[in-house]
Amino acid sequence: MASRQPSEGSTVLISLILWVIIFALLNIGSNFFRSSEGATILGGFVGSFLFFLQMTFIGAIKRDVKLLETVLAVIITAMISSSVHRVSGTTSIIFSIGWIFYLNHASTKIYSKLEETNTVVSGKKRK
């Protein structure tokens, strides 16, 4: 059974809605994220999901995310997480770098399979 990929429009809409929800949760729960060291680090982890959703949003629109968009997304994420706590901002940068490696690995894995499929299909000769 082949899995269907969501359309660009639904990906943009879902990532935007989830971004707004996580942004609201960070602001509403800011007192919780300031309460202890573990909660502060958790705030950075939750903030890094904003980065992941921003990259999903940009990738669905542009299909190719460059270094500038990635750096701007990390800066925006760090600023939002820093509004909760400074340590949350720092840890969100660290977790966002982890997301960069994960997204790069997943992208390479998916697109290498697509290239192999295209090579096999186009490599056949007709007589």
Curated annotation (Swiss-Prot):
Any stretches that span the bilayer, and where are they?
13-33, 41-61, 65-85, 87-107
Q: Where in the cell is it found?
A: Membrane
Tell me one Pfam family matched here: Keratin_assoc
Topology relative to the lipid bilayer, per the entry, is: Multi-pass membrane protein
Q: Which GO terms describe its cellular component?
A: membrane
Protein name stated in the entry: Protein KRTCAP2 homolog
Q: Does the keyword Manganese apply?
A: no
Outline the subunit composition. Component of the oligosaccharyltransferase (OST) complex.
Q: Does the keyword Transmembrane apply?
A: yes
